[in-house]
């Protein structure tokens, strides 16, 4: 296996206007500080204030949004990164791994990847994703492109429907239909950073948020060697060339992951498991005492000095013993969080170090906190209790169903733009208003300028005399609608749906 040298991975160059020449340690750190400023000041980060973590449209500011969750993930990611670097320093391996002058960038990349990890999520979280994918599947039927005779293709879009004697074009149609019907928050995050926001981040910083390595247009089984890394779509056809360049710049083999992404993933796993339970108590779904009993009974096998007793039991006893300065709820979650971090962060750091050859190569086919250890079992305990007692709560399920309906309804409302012929839509884009299409003109005007410009830029580069042009134009038109609706906050999507459905003025 090739030697481990992080100087080959922490690539501080950019896609555009990249700094030139050999850089000192301080100059390289300044480049990543520039990344930090671009990310923190981006509208995509600000919109996380009004996007769902667990409870959509929540007015209680104590309950987490995507932004507060991401800030917590950022802190845990920094903690894990520092723990890794500290242990490598104790072992005199920083210089061996090319990290002696890159500890600052190492930490910064992890922190900002953690802060950005949810920026591509649509309104209403996973139910928003499901609504987008279900809506497009009902119209494009990507499964028909694989298993049905051409005459049985139910795709309602003529330019994407399979045709006899057009094998090469049909392959592109299959690819496009599959891609459009696999909207995914992580893939949308890559699209936001590169295509829509044009943030021009360093290659290493973008590599940190490429969580999954499967293209959205992938058809068929994934290789066992990359089953975990490819379990979800990680990028779209629209970013294919950019990802190819990213892989080259970061020396990543096909379908492999950037090393620091494992740290971001572990930080997210640790953060949301405790946070979801705390938010449920804040929402009065259950009390702290009820939560403790849920956790206790779900653990099953209890022994003195077990991990459960050291983490959960200890938090419960301390919160009951000290009620002078804080509420029992505050005390319990403070101790639970501290105990959880003190156990899981060192374990995640050591797992990173122990598996560094595979992680550096990008082929470690599991999460850091996904193994047969008690630490993994503790995380699963938190997740299972949340699934059984939080996500299945009637109030949560009702809000999720409402969110699904809002996103589906908005797609119904903007559907006329997808029904226009290629020539009519091209004319509408050029003139912005057409008298013969009053509804479509008004809908087009409502689209974000940023999203419209992204569509115009990419379509203007397509050869209009090519047989692929109608297929690819429609693909980017679908991306335009998905970009706009997925970029809404929960509250904006809710209000926009009610306004356009004439529920309120």
Swiss-Prot record:
InterPro entries: dGTP_triP_hydro_central_sf, dGTPase, dGTPase-like, dNTPase_1, HD/PDEase_dom, HD_domain. Its cofactor is Mg(2+). PROSITE patterns: HD (PS51831). GO terms for molecular function: dGTPase activity; magnesium ion binding. Keywords: Hydrolase, Magnesium. Its EC number is 3.1.5.1. SMART domains: HDc. Residues 66-273 form the HD domain. It is an enzyme of class 3 (hydrolase). Gene3D superfamilies: Hypothetical protein af1432, putative deoxyguanosinetriphosphate triphosphohydrolase like domain. It holds the Pfam family HD. GO terms for biological process: dGTP catabolic process. It catalyses: dGTP + H2O = 2'-deoxyguanosine + triphosphate + H(+). The keyword Lipid metabolism does not apply. Belongs to the dGTPase family. Type 1 subfamily. dGTPase preferentially hydrolyzes dGTP over the other canonical NTPs. Homotetramer. This is Deoxyguanosinetriphosphate triphosphohydrolase.
């Amino acid at each position: 296996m090739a030697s481990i040298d992080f100087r080959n991975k922490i690539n501080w160059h950019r896609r555009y206007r990249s700094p030139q020449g050999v850089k000192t340690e301080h100059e390289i750190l300044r480049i990543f500080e520039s990344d930090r400023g671009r990310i923190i000041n981006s509208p995509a980060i600000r919109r996380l204030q009004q996007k769902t973590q667990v409870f959509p449209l929540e007015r209680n500011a104590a309950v987490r949004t995507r932004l507060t969750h991401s800030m917590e993930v950022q802190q845990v990611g920094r903690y894990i990164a520092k723990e890794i670097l500290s242990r490598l320093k104790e072992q005199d391996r920083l210089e061996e791994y090319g990290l002696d002058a890159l500890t600052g960038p190492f930490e910064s990349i992890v922190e900002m990847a953690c802060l950005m990890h949810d920026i591509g999520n649509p309104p209403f979280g996973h139910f928003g994703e499901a609504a987008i994918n279900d809506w497009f599947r009902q119209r494009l039927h990507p499964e028909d492109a694989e298993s049905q005779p051409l005459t049985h293709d139910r795709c309602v879009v003529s330019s994407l429907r399979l045709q006899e004697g057009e094998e090469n074009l049909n392959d592109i149609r299959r690819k496009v239909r599959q891609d459009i019907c696999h909207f995914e928050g992580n893939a949308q995050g890559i699209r936001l950073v590169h295509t829509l926001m044009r943030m021009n981040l360093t290659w290493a910083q973008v590599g940190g948020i490429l969580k999954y390595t499967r293209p959205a247009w992938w058809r068929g089984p994934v290789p066992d060697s990359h089953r975990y890394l490819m379990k979800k779509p990680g990028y779209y056809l629209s970013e294919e060339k950019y990802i190819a360049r990213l892989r080259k710049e970061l020396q990543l083999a096909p379908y492999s992951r950037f090393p620091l992404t494992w740290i971001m993933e572990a930080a997210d796993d640790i953060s949301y498991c405790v946070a979801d339970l705390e938010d449920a108590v804040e929402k009065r779904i259950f009390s702290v005492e009820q939560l403790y009993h849920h956790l206790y009974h779900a653990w099953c096998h209890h022994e003195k000095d077990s991990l459960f007793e050291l983490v959960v039991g200890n938090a419960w006893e301390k919160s009951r013993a000290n009620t002078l300065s804080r509420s029992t709820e505050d005390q319990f979650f403070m101790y639970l969080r501290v105990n959880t971090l003190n156990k899981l962060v060192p374990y995640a750091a050591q797992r990173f170090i122990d598996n560094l050859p595979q992680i550096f190569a990008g082929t470690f086919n599991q999460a850091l906190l996904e193994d047969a250890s008690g630490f993994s079992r503790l995380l699963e305990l938190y997740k299972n209790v949340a699934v059984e007692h939080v996500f299945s709560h009637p109030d949560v399920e009702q809000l999720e169903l409402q969110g699904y309906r809002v996103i589906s309804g908005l797609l119904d409302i903007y559907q006329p733009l997808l029904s226009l012929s290629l020539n009519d839509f091209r004319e509408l884009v050029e003139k912005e208003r057409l008298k013969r299409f009053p509804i479509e003109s008004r809908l087009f005007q409502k689209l974000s300028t940023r999203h419209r410009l992204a569509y115009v830029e990419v379509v203007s580069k397509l050869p209009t005399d090519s047989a692929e042009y109608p297929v690819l134009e429609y693909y980017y038109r679908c991306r335009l609608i998905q970009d706009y609706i997925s970029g809404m906050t929960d509250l904006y999507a809710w209000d926009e749906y009610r306004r356009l459905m004439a529920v309120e003025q």
